[in-house]
Amino acid sequence: MKVYKDIFTNDEVCSDSYAQEDPFGNPEFREIAFEVKSNKRIKGNDDYGIADNSEDAVEGMGADVEHVIDIVDSFQLTSTSLSKKEYSAYVKNFMQRILKHLEEKKPDRVEIFKTKAQPLIKHILTNFDDFEFYMGESLDMEAGLIYSYYKGEEITPRFVYISDGLFEEKY
């Protein structure tokens, strides 16, 4: 299994157990980012009702049961709120830091990043109110933000990650 970690904080933020798709359904963004679909799951109930009828099992769930988004729960992501102005300042700094990282570690990615990052960020800024932002476990604002949005009538959000802000670790 591959786990994706933030290049600046080593926060685990995703894994290859989630199918990667084109961000926002746009294949042009695929060279710089990927999108994964989340699911809801039930957390906290020790009695799974294995021997019971499944309808009875749901009725019998205790007060300690909660519905969670799998990605948020598995990787201890925390929602954060930013104004559009704060986000613009953050993303400018973050993109410069990624560019510097690429120049040092992956010079072959520099031109692709320069070409593809701007349209992606423009899309996010244009649709700013549709997004919720998440941070990794360290809650470090130097790390990459994870972008969450709802596609169409889906009941769980999709999460978008900037690929050059991550590295893979195999387990």
Swiss-Prot record:
Molecular function GO terms recorded: calcium ion binding
Keyword Coiled coil applies: no
- Main subcellular location of this protein, as a coarse class: cytoplasm
Gene3D superfamilies per the record?
A: Metal Binding Protein, Guanine Nucleotide Exchange Factor, Chain A (2.170.150.10)
Cellular-component GO terms for this entry: cytoplasm
**Subcellular location(s) per record:** Cytoplasm
Q: Which UniProt keywords apply?
A: Calcium, Cytoplasm
- Pfam family membership, one: TCTP
Start and end of every TCTP domain? 1-171
Entries under InterPro entries matching the protein: Mss4-like_sf, Mss4/transl-control_tumour, TCTP, Translation_control_tumour_CS, Translational_control_tumour_p
The keyword Cytoplasm is assigned to this record: yes
Q: Which PANTHER family match?
A: TRANSLATIONALLY CONTROLLED TUMOR PROTEIN-RELATED, TRANSLATIONALLY-CONTROLLED TUMOR PROTEIN
The free-text function statement in the UniProt record for this protein reads:
Involved in calcium binding and microtubule stabilization.
Give the family, as the similarity comment puts it: Belongs to the TCTP family.
* Name this polypeptide is given: Translationally-controlled tumor protein homolog
The gene coding this protein: TCTP
